[in-house]
Every structure is written in C-alpha cells, then in structure tokens.
Amino acid sequence: MAKAVRKAFAADADNYDRARRKLVPCFDDFYRTALELLPFGADDRFELLDLGAGTGLLSAMIAEAFPNARLTLFDLTPEMLTIARQRLKPVGKRVKFVTADFAKAAPSKPYDAVVSALAIYHLPDSGKRHLFADIFKYLTPGGVFINADQVAGEDAAIDERAR
C-alpha cells in the first residue's frame, strides 16, 4: 500500500496544493482549526512532528504562527518534501525533513505536539490503531496529538448527508 500511495503522490506533487483547496470542504477553516487547537502561546518554544506532512502546508502555518517552534516533517514522498523545503525555506534551521513511512518509522526523540492533516486516513483501521498507540509514545508528558483528517460515517447515508 505504501508504494501505491508514494507513487500517486509523487505523480501529483506539483498540483497537490491547488487540488487540495478544491477538494477539501471549508479548506481555510479546516487548517485554521488544526492550528488553533495547538495549546501554545505565540512565543512558546516547542518541538512538533508533522506526520504525512506532504507539501508542508500545515507546518508552514504553524511555523508562521509560532516563530520559536521547531518542526520535523515526515513524509513518504520525496517529491512532496521537495515542495515543503521550498515552502519552509524562510524558516531556516527550525525545520527538519525526513523521508519515511510514518506508519513504520519512529522518531528519534519525543515531541510536545504531533500533528497530521489528511494523511492518516490512508491507513487501514489496524494501521491506525497501531499508529495512534505509537504516537502517544512519541509525546512528551502533557503533549498533544492533533489529527485533521477525513472520516467516514457509520454508513453511506451518513456520508452522503455530510457532503
């Protein structure tokens, strides 16, 4: 599954951000809500891990809102991280990029926050359960996990009403 996901995102990396704005309902609210859930003050220093960071859209918003935050971006697709590097170039040494399958790779240190946007839903349910258990191992005491993602309703009728 990881190979198929990597291949699809590698092929679409250059168009991903434009498509995301069209495909994600309430795009601005979606990302702003994830940002606002971070329990830090604007001047706080903290370490953040972005799982499935893609082109770095959420991380760039976080870096701008929290100029003392240090960010690590994990993504499976080098082409997506190339775009993230360009986007986050102004952030300088506060950001680190790791090409890795976040479902299998473990970070080398604990983080004050772990975030993910539109990535974890690609995993099967068993993979999600395993990842969620691992994420709590990655967090410092009192750390937070924010998953901004798509979810399926209990049945097709509920999904249809949500659209």
Regions found by a protein language model. Give the residues of each.
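Class I SAM-dependent methyltransferase SAM/SAH-binding core
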Residues: 49, 55-104
